[in-house]
Swiss-Prot record:
CDD domains in alphabetical order: HATPase_MutL-MLH-PMS-like (cd16926), MutL_Trans_MutL (cd03482)
GO molecular function: ATP binding; ATP hydrolysis activity; ATP-dependent DNA damage sensor activity; mismatched DNA binding
Keyword Transcription attributed: no
Protein name per the record: DNA mismatch repair protein MutL
Cystine pairs: none
GO biological process: one example: mismatch repair
Amino acid sequence: MPIRILPSDLSSQISAGEIIERPASVVKEIIENSIDAGSKNINIIVENSGFQSIILKDDGCGIDKKDLLLAVCHHATSKINSLSDLDKLTTFGFRGEALASIRAVSRLTLISCTRFNDVAAKIYLEGFCSKNIILQPIAHPEGTTIIVDNLFYNIPVRLKFLKNKKLEFSKICEVVKKIALSHFYINFSLKHNNKLITQYNSINNRKNKINRLKDIFDTLDTSEFLEIKEKKYRMVLFGWISHPYNFKKIKNIQYCYVNNRYLYNNIFVNAVRAAYSKIEQKKNISFVLYLTIESFNIDINIHPTKNEIKFHNPDVVYTFIYEAVFSYLKKIKEKYYFNFSCKKQTQLNKEKEFYFYDSDPTFLTLISSIFFKKKQIFKNIKNKIKHNNFISKSTPLEKYESSIGRLLIIIHKYYGLIYHDNNFLLLSFPVAKGIVRKQKLKNNIQKENIIEYFLSNIKINLTSQEYLILFNQKEILSKFGFHLIFKKKYVILSSIPAFLKKCNFHIIISNFFAFLFLKKQVFISDIVDWFYINVFIELKNWTYIRGIEVLLEIEYYCPLLLINPPSKLLQKININAALCILKI
């Protein structure tokens, strides 16, 4: 068969198939068009799950009658004029494909009126085969009415795959729900076969936004959710997350929005789950979160239905979401455990017997020499930065220059090439991170800011000498989050530092106590060094973003270190000597 150009009606049906998959796709596209038109009231009327007809009425700005025919053509849009406009998008639509795709697979009626028109205009089209399209005058208020009849009438194969009408209508309801969740100031109503299914009234007060959740999830108790709002890294995160210590079974509600556009994104989900895992292990985590980010930092034009986007700096986005959620969860945890500690301890779980070991010195020497090796776990370094003023809002992260200098490139995975005062320096990231970790741990201890992980009471049998060593060290251990209750011949361990939670902490605790018994007397610096060697993970692949974050952390946590940095941290590269050798 020779190569030939497809007829316009066939090519239109093929391209429409990428955008209009089912009736819910039509509803999504026309609602988004109405929102772009500034509508305050959007009414959707569906017959026979959308296969017979879908009608949308809005009170937006409307389409001028001279543009009505153009609006249903391919690549016709008022949203962008040039390629550079893609970096400034604030609207849902921009391709000019929605109405053209709907037209290709249905019988479409379009009625619209602007405030500048004396009378509305109406057109009727059947696919792209329509000829001699007549623009008819008609009475209509300002706004637009779209009537989509007999969807897929000209593609019977598609109808065979969409037999479950109940399922298709549930998809329509889900689309309306998702859009209503991000547009609080719009009234939405949905009717099916002349029956009102849902109606969401507009909410004009920010404090009452959670009422939209009540309307959409009618069985939801909103007291189970916490409102969060955070602004950082030129981004804003707003929304609700489920209470970490609410043990009722609630729906697994997970909705993510970027610039009011719904999407399911792994960065959101993973960041939220990581934050919860630091506080409380929960299977059912619910959240409705809205991320506002500058348009040039995302790419929307990567999927036909625009259900996916690409972040230009995903690590920064992940860190921001993680930090925001974790900070709120941490506050709740502190409040929860303060109230919990005031109650009688009769509600604690039954004590678990954990017999430590015999006092054989050979065994103590052996166990203290064993280091528990953990698998490398991805940790985003930015969740350690706690202050907004690290980076100026006007300075891009990649161009930020710290007191050490500006990071140019990563060399051999572990080292960074730094430029400062016409000099080139080589920085060891593992050494830098180790210094920062130790300093941060010391700072948290001094400020009594160590997060504790509460255990079911663990009973540890000890010899009299071991008991005495722990008793003498109880104050310094409590600063690290080890809460010990001393009985006559044994101790009860009720909490450990939260950073041990994901470790096999029984082994870690055994090794740590063996270390204490051998040393007999320890200082804060000794314990910090022990945790750094035995617990903390060393990154094996340093990225540019993580490198910058280490520079920022050194500048903030260890400013005096920059006056006289150790040789293992920073080495000057003699460029002049190399130039003299290479000079012709």
